[in-house]
Design a protein with these regions (language model features):
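Alpha-helical scaffold elements adjacent to nucleotide-binding pockets in ATP/GTP-utilizing enzyme cores
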Residues: 3, 31-35, 61-69, 93-101
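Short acidic, glycine/serine/threonine-rich loops at helix termini
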Residues: 27-30, 55-60, 92-96, 128-130, ...
């Protein structure tokens, strides 16, 4: 679920894939559909996979299950496309539907640039000579604006520092040295698809996904790093992802929660809970705008389960 929320946060649309040979919905179906509604994914297609392993009667029964399950969601009137991924059956129809039913939004390139970091890495091979080393790379999707080669960028919350036992996070300033998108070098990058940004950062900072969850923008334009958040909370009636539907109780003070904000994942402790408002102290800070939505998960049994979302006040 953490992976799904992080990736879906930067998407313009989604494919909701179900298997024709099992009953719909499964626990994961409910969880993913609620998550999609929560983060505002409106452009959806339903893909009915594995039609090659069921007969016509079962395929039609599964179609009716899907129609019933999607009532009241953004997928209620979405096309349901039967496919066999293994045999590549109807893939041309699916590609056509993606092009026709998930429109590319009009982008305003004049607004402050934002990129959510999904990956970060060191591209230098072991044994590379010092003079041949290149800076660290951050990868992700540009949410708004555009980035150009030569831009001075800021990365928040940045890296963890420990000065005299006091732990803090320090934002990073870097310069864009290279941009790659669509498998080739580009001079500027805009929203749509994934982009790799080569920087002059020490590669030890970016290696092994060290900057995943950060936000990149032009220096001086990013929102404040938040160590505590006050949230307007909207809880689901039932927790999702469990085999048995479990009623969601109100959030309590001193309760641990896991929060997803864009591609950032952090844990926190509720320091105050009242009515539909919760104040949470975060173990790792996030960089997010007021009004941003944050997914909330609670430990139920042995797993963290999605229970609702909050809007940053």
């Amino acid at each position: 679920m953490v992976t799904m929320l992080s990736g879906a946060a930067i998407m313009d649309g989604s494919l909701f894939v179900v298997s024709a040979n099992v009953k719909t919905p499964q626990a994961q179906d409910r969880e993913h559909m609620l998550a999609a509604q929560m983060i505002g994914l409106r452009n959806m297609l339903v893909v009915q996979n594995k039609i090659d392993v069921v007969d016509r009667t079962r395929a039609k029964a599964n179609y009716e299950e899907i129609k019933e399950f999607t009532k009241g969601t953004s997928a209620e009137n979405a096309p349901i496309i039967p496919v066999s991924a293994q045999h590549k059956l109807n893939m041309d129809v699916l590609i056509w539907a993606i092009q026709e039913k998930i429109p590319t939004p009009k982008r305003d390139q004049s607004i402050d640039s934002r990129m959510s970091v999904l990956r970060s890495f060191d591209v230098n091979r072991p044994g590379t000579q010092v003079e041949e080393l290149v800076g660290g790379v951050v990868g992700g999707s540009i949410v708004q604006g555009l980035f150009k080669k030569g831009d001075e960028i800021e990365i928040r919350p940045g890296i963890k520092t420990d000065t005299g036992g006091k732990v803090a996070y320090e934002s990073l300033i870097a310069r864009v040295g290279a941009l790659q998108a669509g498998g080739g070098d580009v001079k500027q990058a805009t929203p749509g698809g994934l982009v790799a940004v080569g920087t002059d950062l020490d590669p030890s900072v970016t290696k092994s996904d060290g900057l995943v969850g950060n936000v990149v923008g032009r220096a001086g334009t990013l929102p404040t790093t938040l160590e505590k958040v006050s949230l307007d909370v909207d809880l689901f009636e039932k927790a999702v992802g469990t085999e048995q539907l479990v009623a969601v109780q109100k959030i309590r003070s001193n309760e641990p929660l896991v929060l997803n904000a864009g591609t950032a994942v952090t844990s926190g402790i509720v320091i105050s809970a009242r009515e539909d408002i919760a104040d949470v102290s975060l173990k790792k800070p996030i960089c997010a705008e007021v009004g941003s939505k944050v997914a909330l998960s609670r430990r139920i049994g042995e797993s963290w389960r999605l229970i609702g979302f909050g809007t940053i006040r």
